[in-house]
């Protein structure tokens, strides 16, 4: 008899627990996401042993962990003709021919926009 009352409670708790850890699709134009992606690009360029800057080519997937400001992003970046410390990387042309390099990366970044704090929790990149 006790199991009849415990089972529904256990299912509710498991359901709430399961829902709280899922990533959900988000709009790529969401302000907090856009700011996080600027940090991801800065982080990537800072950590490259390359004098040239990379820029976003395409965000393949953008997700946010439910009830948090943790973002998971799958993106592609390309090597530009500009140096990584140049001002306007967005308008730099991509390298072509022998210098051409493209990477596909997955980042998990936690954002606290109200204090301008971004933390890279995990990142993986491969050349394509």
Curated annotation (Swiss-Prot):
Name under which the protein is recorded: Cystatin-12
Source organism (scientific name): Rattus norvegicus (Rat)
Tree of life domain: Eukaryota
Keywords, alphabetical: Disulfide bond, Glycoprotein, Protease inhibitor, Secreted, Signal, Thiol protease inhibitor
Gene: Cst12
Leader peptide range in chain numbering: 1-21
Keyword Lyase on entry: no
One annotated GO molecular function: cysteine-type endopeptidase inhibitor activity
Subcellular location: Secreted
GO cellular component, one term: extracellular region
Family that this chain belongs to: Belongs to the cystatin family.
Xref: InterPro entries: Cystatin_dom, Cystatin_sf, Cystatin_spermatogenesis
Function of the protein: May play a specialized role in spermatogenesis.
Annotated S-S bridges: 82-92, 105-125
Glycosylation sites recorded in the entry for this protein: 122
């Amino acid at each position: 008899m006790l199991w009849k009352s415990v089972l529904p409670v256990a299912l509710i708790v498991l359901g709430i627990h399961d829902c709280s850890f899922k990533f959900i699709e988000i709009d790529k134009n969401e302000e907090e996401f856009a700011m996080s992606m600027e940090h991801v690009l800065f982080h990537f360029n800072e950590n490259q042993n390359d004098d040239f800057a990379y820029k976003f080519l395409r965000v393949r997937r953008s997700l946010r962990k439910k009830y948090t400001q943790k973002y998971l992003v799958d993106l592609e970046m390309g090597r530009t003709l500009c140096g990584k410390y140049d001002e306007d990387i967005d308008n730099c042309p991509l390298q072509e021919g022998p210098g051409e390099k493209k990477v596909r990366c997955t980042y998990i970044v936690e954002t606290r926009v109200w204090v301008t704090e971004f933390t890279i929790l995990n990142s993986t990149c491969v050349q394509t």
